[in-house]
UniProtKB/Swiss-Prot annotation:
Its EC number is 7.1.1.-. PANTHER family: NADH-UBIQUINONE OXIDOREDUCTASE CHAIN 3 (PTHR11058:SF9). Keywords: Cell inner membrane, Cell membrane, Membrane, NAD, Quinone, Translocase, Transmembrane, Transmembrane helix, Transport, Ubiquinone. Pfam families: Oxidored_q4. This is NADH-quinone oxidoreductase subunit A. It comes from Ralstonia pickettii (strain 12J). NDH-1 shuttles electrons from NADH, via FMN and iron-sulfur (Fe-S) centers, to quinones in the respiratory chain. The immediate electron acceptor for the enzyme in this species is believed to be ubiquinone. Couples the redox reaction to proton translocation (for every two electrons transferred, four hydrogen ions are translocated across the cytoplasmic membrane), and thus conserves the redox energy in a proton gradient.
Length: 119
């Protein structure tokens, strides 16, 4: 296996990480650092904060967010499939059918488990 072909990729990664670290270090060293309580408090539309900004969220918010991301990715995979359906033919159609069936089974599972109920 010829590893010399990967040298430009390695060089790109090293330069990118090095440049990023250098810029963050320069900003940290040269930037002003004068914190006070008003700057460190959360901004809430010009009003005094109603509650602590560091309060814990209900786990259901995270669950709904994760489920949204999963089904959003499913939709993102459906668009190219719909565009290329004529070129991929029946094998692509059946492959997408299996893909959709897996997500349908997952959706029914989370529905039956009550993950979508908000009580």
């Amino acid at each position: 296996m010829n590893l010399e072909a990967y040298f430009p990729v390695l060089l790109f990664i090293v330069v990118g990480v090095g440049l990023g670290l250098a810029l963050m270090t320069i900003g940290r060293v040269l930037g002003p650092n004068n914190p006070d309580p008003d700057k460190l408090s959360p901004y809430e539309c010009g009003f005094e904060a109603f509650e602590d900004a560091r309060m814990k969220f209900d786990v259901r918010y995270y669950l709904i967010a994760i489920l949204f991301i999963l089904f959003d990715l499913e939709t993102a995979f459906l668009f190219p499939w719909g565009v290329a359906l004529r070129e991929i033919g029946w094998p692509g159609f059946f492959a997408m059918g299996v893909f959709l069936l897996e997500f349908l089974v997952g959706f029914v599972y989370i529905w039956k488990k009550g993950a979508l109920d908000w009580e």
